[in-house]
């Protein structure tokens, strides 16, 4: 993906509020990941999700969802905020396709946590995106709904998160209703199918580690299982998968910083997810210039993490 001299650069788009947190002045720090991307010949743009759709249930009568519904409450099959944010990312790509300074065929999308969910939805619904980096997405993202571990469907359907999903999804978190009790086992699809919709494009499922704050609540193993279950679709479309068996019940997520970056489908668990020390690993994944995965920390980042 690196641009040839005189050609437009690839671009990464990220969901988030804007600039990242400043480095701690008491410790050595690499330049912010966005600065490293730009220095490496990439472009970078940040999407402000709240400018598209508010991150709360009260906002469902406003934003793009409210605009379509003319300020009325949404219908059961209408979007939640995740799909609305993905729609906004696609409209951003519409613009990038008109900008001759950008190679619009090499635009990726990335996000962490709820924005990791949104990045995965964006990639699944818009075939124009060439790359997705899905960070710590958990339930409603890359994690299998049916795996009874950590965050559950009932959390997504609760008061703090229900607006992320379509209204119809809420019935899968009900103990009592006119149609009876439903749970994750009643959902006709699961996360591996969402990941499969990204094939054969570059798809990275990433997590940090509990010791550094990426809680077990996110269920790293559950997302790895979903990626394993998505492998057949990547192979069907001529892409290289994780290189493990399709037995998602047997396969275990690799150890920290033992990353699976050799194919179009990738999984990795890092000490500092999506932070500056790891950005070169993501660049190598996108560029196809894979490197050994031994951990080596270095202040200038050229030898930092998964080098």
Q: Model features per residue range: what roles?
A:
Residues 1, 21, 90-186:
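Primarily recognizes the serine-hydrolase "nucleophile elbow" in alpha/beta-hydrolase
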Residues 1-29, 127, 164-174, 182, ...:
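Alpha/beta-hydrolase-fold serine-hydrolase catalytic core, especially in secreted/extracellular enzymes
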Residues 1-98, 138-148:
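Cap/lid segment of the alpha/beta-hydrolase catalytic domain
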Residues 37-40, 102, 113-114, 125, ...:
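Extracellular/periplasmic catalytic domains that process cell-envelope and extracellular macromolecules
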Residues 47, 110-112, 132-137, 206-208, ...:
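Generic beta-strand/beta-sheet core signal
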Residues 49, 55-60, 121-122, 134-135, ...:
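Short, solvent-exposed loop/turn and secondary-structure capping segments
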Residues 76-84, 109-110, 120, 178-189, ...:
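Alpha-helix capping and helix-loop boundary segments enriched in small/acidic/polar residues
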């Amino acid at each position: 993906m690196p641009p040839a001299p005189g050609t437009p650069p690839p671009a990464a788009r990220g969901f988030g509020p804007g600039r990242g947190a400043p480095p701690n002045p008491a410790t050595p720090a690499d330049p912010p990941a966005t600065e490293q991307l730009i220095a490496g010949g990439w472009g970078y743009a940040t999407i402000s999700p709240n400018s598209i759709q508010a991150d709360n249930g009260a906002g469902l009568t406003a934003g793009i969802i409210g605009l379509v519904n003319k300020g009325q409450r949404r219908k059961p099959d209408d979007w939640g905020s995740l799909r609305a944010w993905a729609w906004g990312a696609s409209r951003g790509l519409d613009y990038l396709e008109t900008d001759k300074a950008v190679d619009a065929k090499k635009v990726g999308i990335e996000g962490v946590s709820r924005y990791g969910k949104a990045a995965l939805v964006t990639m699944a619904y818009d075939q124009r995106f060439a790359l997705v980096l899905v960070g710590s997405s958990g339930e409603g993202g890359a994690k299998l709904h049916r795996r009874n571990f950590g965050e559950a469907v009932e959390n997504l359907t609760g008061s703090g998160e229900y607006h992320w999903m379509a209204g119809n999804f809420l019935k899968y978190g009900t103990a009592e209703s006119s149609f009876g009790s439903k749970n994750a086992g009643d959902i006709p699809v699961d996360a591996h199918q969402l990941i499969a919709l990204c094939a054969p494009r570059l798809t990275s499922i990433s997590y940090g580690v509990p010791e550094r704050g990426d809680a077990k609540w996110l269920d790293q193993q559950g997302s790895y299982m979903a990626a394993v279950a998505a492998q057949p679709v990547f192979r069907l479309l001529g892409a290289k998968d994780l290189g493990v068996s399709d037995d998602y019940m047997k396969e275990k997520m690799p150890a920290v910083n033992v990353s699976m970056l050799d194919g179009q489908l990738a999984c990795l668990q890092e000490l500092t997810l999506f932070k500056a020390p790891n950005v070169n690993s993501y660049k190598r994944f996108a560029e196809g210039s894979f490197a050994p995965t031994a951990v080596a920390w270095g202040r200038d980042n050229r030898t930092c993490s998964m080098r």
